């Protein structure tokens, strides 16, 4: 017997989705960090922060709640501008943010701080929160847009955090269950150790919505997500109505960023990883179909993990 929409929504609400009280706690913690860091950077390095945007899965409401082996991750985009920016490299901006965070939290262990390719990260073990501070050089001619730099290879990508949030909201307005399906797919990805990032999943799910529409049960639509990956092999170029031009890419997987035509968000997926993603999706689709026919919750746990449940314990 297939899972009902009510059962899947129960699982999403009680196991996957970040509860309202936790969201409020994290929001308050992030707001305090933003206020302190903004002041620290201005006083310490004369860096002007023109705008701050909470971004990523947290802002899109597709984030999963904290588990025993995963933190809640919040992206905070700092739009940087002013004459001082011209004197800085992106690496130095990340370094200055990292140094400011160290000074702001002198009692935290050094391993709670990290400089990544495009962000400086601070981890709060007590609340289970990771905050990625992402510096973006503001484009004064395009509202919400700016350039995000890679600290390792020096490449830059145009981005628009508010536009990415709007993209998901518009899909949710079109399909009230869009975020539920994204969270289902993210839990599947994590449990199956599939090398897809959260942003990739959001975009693939949006593409499947565009192609198939919102008809059908939630269970079937999740299976259709797996089926799309399995049948396409992720060899099709995925674009969106927001894209105006389609450049040619040579990467194994091409999914265009809906806010930047020149950005292939899957450019770092290797051919071996593409094959692995497709292999996992094929196997998972078969497992999901078998679980649906058998009506066996234990089989669903093979896809979603031991925490999978669709009703209160008796």
Curated annotation (Swiss-Prot):
GO cellular component, one term: cytosol
Binding site for Mg(2+): 73, 75
Cross-referenced Gene3D superfamilies: 2'-5'-oligoadenylate synthetase 1, domain 2, Beta Polymerase, domain 2
Biological processes per GO annotation: defense response to virus; nucleotide metabolic process
Residues reported to bind ATP: 60, 75, 186, 197-199, 263
Pfam families recorded: SMODS
Keywords annotated in UniProt: Antiviral defense, ATP-binding, Magnesium, Metal-binding, Nucleotide metabolism, Nucleotide-binding, Nucleotidyltransferase, Transferase
Cofactors demanded by this protein: Mg(2+)
UniProt superkingdom: Bacteria
GO molecular function, one term: double-stranded RNA binding
Extent of the signal sequence: none
Enzyme Commission number: 2.7.7.-
Described purpose of this protein according to its UniProt entry: Cyclic nucleotide synthase (second messenger synthase) of a CBASS antivirus system. CBASS (cyclic oligonucleotide-based antiphage signaling system) provides immunity against bacteriophage. The CD-NTase protein synthesizes cyclic nucleotides in response to infection; these serve as specific second messenger signals. The signals activate a diverse range of effectors, leading to bacterial cell death and thus abortive phage infection. A type III CBASS system.
Family membership noted in the UniProt record: Belongs to the CD-NTase family. C01 subfamily.
Subunit structure: Forms complexes with Cap7 with 1:1 and 2:2 stoichimetry, and a 1:1:6 CdnC:Cap7:Cap6 complex.
Protein name: CBASS oligonucleotide cyclase CdnC
Organism: Escherichia coli
Gene name of the record: cdnC
């Amino acid at each position: 017997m297939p899972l009902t929409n009510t059962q899947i929504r129960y699982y999403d609400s009680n196991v996957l989705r970040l509860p309202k009280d936790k969201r409020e706690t994290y929001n308050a913690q992030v707001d305090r960090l933003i206020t302190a860091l903004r002041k620290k950077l201005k006083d310490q390095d004369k860096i002007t922060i023109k705008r701050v945007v909470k971004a990523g899965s947290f802002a899109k409401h597709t984030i999963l709640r904290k588990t025993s082996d995963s933190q809640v991750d919040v992206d905070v985009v700092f739009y940087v501008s002013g004459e001082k920016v011209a004197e800085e490299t992106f690496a130095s901006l990340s370094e200055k943010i990292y140094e400011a965070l160290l000074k702001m939290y002198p009692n935290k262990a050094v391993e709670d701080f990290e400089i990544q390719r495009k962000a400086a990260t601070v981890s709060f073990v007590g609340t289970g929160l990771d905050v990625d501070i992402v510096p973006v050089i503001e484009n004064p001619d395009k509202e919400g847009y700016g350039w995000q730099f890679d600290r390792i290879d020096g490449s830059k990508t145009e981005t628009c955090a508010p536009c990415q949030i709007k993209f998901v909201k518009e899909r949710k307005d079109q399909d009230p269950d869009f975020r539920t399906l994204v969270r289902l797919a993210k839990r599947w990805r994590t449990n199956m150790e599939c090398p897809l990032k959260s942003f990739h999943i959001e975009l693939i799910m949006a593409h499947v919505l565009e192609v198939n529409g919102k008809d059908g049960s939630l269970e079937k639509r999740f299976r259709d997500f797996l089926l799309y990956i399995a049948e396409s092999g992720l060899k099709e170029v995925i674009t969106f109505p927001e894209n105006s031009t389609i450049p040619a890419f040579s990467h194994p997987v091409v999914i265009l960023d809906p806010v930047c035509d020149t950005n292939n968000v899957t450019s770092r997926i290797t051919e071996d990883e593409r094959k692995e993603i497709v292999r996992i999706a094929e196997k998972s689709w078969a497992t999901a179909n078998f679980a649906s026919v058998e009506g066996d919750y234990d089989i669903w746990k093979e896809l979603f993990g031991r925490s999978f449940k669709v009703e209160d314990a008796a």
